[in-house]
Design a protein with these regions (language model features):
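Alpha-helical transmembrane anchor segments and their immediate juxtamembrane flanks
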Residues: 1-28
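A generic "folded-domain core" signal
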Residues: 22-193
């Protein structure tokens, strides 16, 4: 099984090296689609602008009937990685509460692999909240070994900062793509229920 994984990884690295055009970039998302609204109403002064806030979802743990809570925020911009992760790659911050684990902070990339190694001390992201100083937050990898998600180690400090911040910038290195910055802006800071 290890031999198969190593061979597959080598093939992907080879293909990526052959196709690599070094044109990865972070581009703003197109939040304003080119659509035109047609209204029969005479009164058009009711332009409602929705506030950008953290998304909240919950579910019930069937084992102990406890409520799991998830607060998530998707980046305003995205990275456009080369093969095999082509397409818009957004970063998502998720604050998770589960009775059996407590509070966690997860960072998840849509397409791509986060690079960081605990042995070499490179398992961290750089984060800036509002106009504060840049801070390092070390992370752990998930138990399943996936590279698209990491768990922030000092979750309580990170959550405390999210409760007051309206702008967050996260910088992370990605496999064969280098370092990218993702920006998050909300009209309301994290409010936990």
């Amino acid at each position: 099984m290890k031999k198969f994984i190593v061979i597959t990884l080598c093939v992907l690295v080879f293909i990526g090296a052959c196709i690599n055009s070094n044109n990865s970039s972070v581009a703003p998302s197109d939040e304003t689609a080119n659509t035109e609204e047609v209204s029969d109403s005479v009164n058009t002064d009711t332009n409602e602008v929705s506030e950008k806030t953290w998304d909240f979802t919950s579910d019930t743990d069937d084992m102990d009937d406890s409520v799991n809570k998830y607060y998530s925020l998707r980046s305003d911009n995205f990275a456009n990685f080369d093969f095999p992760y082509q397409g818009d790659s957004y970063l998502t911050i998720t604050v998770r509460y589960m009775k059996k684990y407590g509070y966690d902070v997860l960072l998840n990339i849509d397409n791509g692999q986060m690079v960081g190694n605990e042995f070499n001390g490179t398992n961290y992201v750089r984060v800036r909240f509002d106009n504060g100083k840049v801070e390092k937050y070390y992370y752990s990898e998930p138990n399943d070994g996936s590279a698209d998600c990491v768990f922030i180690k000092n979750a309580s400090k990170f959550i405390k900062k999210c409760k007051t911040a309206k702008t967050i910038i996260i910088e992370q290195e990605f496999y064969q793509e280098g370092v990218h910055q993702f920006k998050f802006h909300v009209d309301k800071s994290l409010e936990m229920k």
